[in-house]
Regions:
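Flexible glycine/proline-rich, aromatic-decorated loop/lid segments
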Residues: 187-203
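Acidic/histidine-rich catalytic neighborhood of metal-dependent amide-processing enzymes
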Residues: 116-191
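Acidic/His- and Gly-rich active-site-bordering loop/insert found
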Residues: 2-115, 132-138
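Acidic-enriched catalytic cores of C-N bond-cleaving enzymes acting on peptides and small amides
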Residues: 181, 190, 197, 211-302
């Protein structure tokens, strides 16, 4: 039987060791969008798995490699962890108080690119495994899948899954992150929304045009795109794409009951995002919580460019 007091004591006693391991891991750049340091970081991840008695391997894909690790436990049950070692680009660098790949411990917090997303979750899970191993065998088989393309839409993960179905068999899987809410209470997520990303492109002319000369007689791409986007959603916040809501499963009474039991987030959202209020006159309570988890449509970025034909 697991002795949770011994686990807590181990974690407290070895916290500095875990922070040092995380610091070592985030020192290695692994910027997926720039293909920077991916192979090197995969090797480090495999190394820290091997150091804990995991059989680990690095599998090549059409992009960044995937690290797979496995260690047997006392039971025939298997728990699978998913994580990723790639990080977002650190730019703009001038907004950093310290270099992004030089970890800095300030006021009890570690700052570096990847500390939160997602290298800290890799090392914290392994830290928990250390605490269990200090008491003997693991209670179940444990597997890790740690990829390097999460920040770039996991383009080749499906290939890895297709080719390794037998290896990936498990009784349960824990996804990449966890955390605490604004009260520092640990949160357990039961699911997340998926995403469908669509890129719209409009081109109306073959060359750049001076607005003062021909802007009144030639079609403008920016306006065409603006008009198109304005048809997607109305002032009432309802999405106007035909069939968009057809297969969405509405929340059950039990879903609402669970959400209602969670603390109100209105003041925290205003503070965190600098918002004065919410859409549709929402002020808080269960309606705001349900709206925050509802299906949505967002415009994430505009990019405009003009090109001039060569002379």
């Amino acid at each position: 039987m697991t002795n949770y007091k011994l686990i807590d004591d181990f974690l407290e006693k070895n916290l500095e060791k875990s922070i040092n391991e995380l610091s070592w891991l985030v020192t290695q750049p692994s910027v997926g969008a720039q293909n920077l340091g991916m192979k090197e970081c995969a090797e480090l991840v495999a190394e820290i798995l091997t150091a804990r008695g995991f059989s680990s391997e690095i599998q090549a894909t059409g992009g960044a490699p995937v690290v797979f690790g496995e260690r047997k436990g006392k039971s025939n049950k298997t728990l699978l962890f998913y994580n990723h070692y790639d990080v977002q680009p650190p730019e703009p660098l001038e907004l950093w108080d310290t270099p992004p790949f030089e970890p800095s411990l300030r006021e009890g917090k570690l700052f570096a690119r990847g500390v939160s997303d997602d290298k800290g979750h890799i090392t914290s899970r392994l830290f928990a495994i250390d605490a269990l191993l200090a008491q003997g065998e693991l209670p179940c088989n444990v597997k890790f899948v740690i990829e390097g393309e999460e920040e770039t839409a996991s383009e080749h993960l499906h290939e890895f899954i297709r080719d390794n179905k037998a290896k990936l068999k498990a009784d349960a899987c824990i996804w990449e992150f966890g955390g605490v809410d604004h009260r520092d209470v640990p949160m357990q997520y039961l699911g997340l929304r998926g995403i469908c990303y669509v890129e719209l492109s409009v081109e109306t002319l073959g060359t750049d045009v001076h607005s003062g000369l021909s802007g009144s007689i030639l079609p403008n791409a920016a306006w065409r795109l603006t008009w198109a986007l304005s048809t997607l959603k109305g002032p009432d916040e309802r999405i106007r794409i035909p069939g968009f809501y057809d297969n969405i499963i509405p929340p059950t009474a039990r879903d609402r009951e669970i959400m209602d039991a969670l603390p109100d987030v209105a003041d925290e959202y205003k503070r965190r995002f600098g918002a004065k209020g919410f859409i549709k006159g929402l002020t808080g309570g269960i309606d705001l919580k349900m709206a925050a988890s509802a299906t949505r449509l967002a415009i994430s970025r505009y990019t405009a460019s003009a090109r001039t034909s060569p002379a």
